[in-house]
Amino acid sequence: MNKKIQSGNELSYGLLKHSQNNHGLVNIGDHIQSCAAEQFMPRIDRYVERDKLNCDINKPTKIILNGWFTDSPKNWPPNPKLIPLFISFHLQPKSAEIIFKKKENIDYLKKFSPIGCRDYQTIKLLNKVGISTYFSFCLTSTLGLKYSSKKRGDKIYLVDPLYSNDFRAISQLSLKSLITSPPIKKIHKLKEYLFPKRKIDGYLPQEIIKKGEMINHYVRANKSNKELYTLAKKYLKKYAKAKLVITSRIHCALPCLALNTPVLFLYDGLFDENQHMARLRGILDHMNILTTQNKDEINELFGKEMNVFHPKDIDWDNPPKNPASHEEFAKDLQARCENFIKN
C-alpha cells in the first residue's frame, strides 16, 4: 500500500549517492554505509547526492542520513522535501566551523533532533551549538540483517591494512603531477601506495601475508552508481564468509562485527584528533585492535580499557572472537530505522 502525507503527494524513498572523489578515487566504504540504510527501505525511488542534499526534489522523500557530512557545507541546509532520519551521523570539525556559521543550519538540525551520532566528537560539536544528540554507534553494525552467511570459508582478507599510511602518501602526492600524468600512469602511481604489502611485515606473520587477499576500498571514480553499489555488496558477501579480516577501515571492520566475521582493526598510530581520532572515539571501543604499541599507551589514549592485541599474542589459526558490546547499539539502530519507515 502506498503511503501518503498530508499534502496528498505519494511518499517516496531515497538512498544516498556518493560521487565525490579524491584524486579520481571514491571510497566504497560510503556505499557500504548506505547498504546498511537500504536494508530498511521498502524500495528506492531515487538517489540523492550526499554532498548536494539541497538538490531539486519534486516530492516528499524519506531518507536515512548516516555517514560522513559535510564536505560541501555550502549546500546546506538540505531540501525541505527531504524527510530525514539523522543517525550514525559524523561531522568533521572543520566542516562544523563552516556549517554552524549559518543559523538556519543549526535550526534545521534542531528540527530533526535528537541527532544520532556515531562518535563522541560529533556529539560535542553538535551539543556546543545547542543541538540535542545521543550516541547511536554506526549503522553498519546492522548489516547482518541482510548480508550474514551460514558459510564460513578459509579466506583471509587484508583490507587497506595500513590506511593511514596510504592516506598520508596520497595527500603528499603532487597535485600537479596527478593532473598532468596520463590516467593509466596516475592509477599505477596511486596503486603503489594503496597496496602496501611490504609495509605490514611488522604487524602480520609472513604466512598470513601470503595467504591474505588484498582488497582496497578506494576504487576508480569512473564507475556508475549502480556499479559502485554492486561492488560494495560483493565485498560484504566476501567478508561474511571470511575466516579473518584485517583492516584499518572502520567501514570494513564494523560490518564484520555485524557479520560475525573475526576482524582485527590494525591501529598504527592515528594521533591527529581532527582528521582521524575524532572518527575513532566511540567506535574502536567495540572491536579488537591489532597494534605493536603498548597496551597501556592505547588505553591511556582512549581513556578506557580497550581490546588490544599485540601480533605475538594472537593464535592466527584461531583468531580472537569479536567483542559483543556493539550488539545493544545494533538492536537500537534497527528499531529506530524500522520505526522511522513505519511512521
Q: Where on the chain are the PLM-derived regions?
A:
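Active-site anion-handling motifs in enzyme catalytic cores
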Residues: 1-343
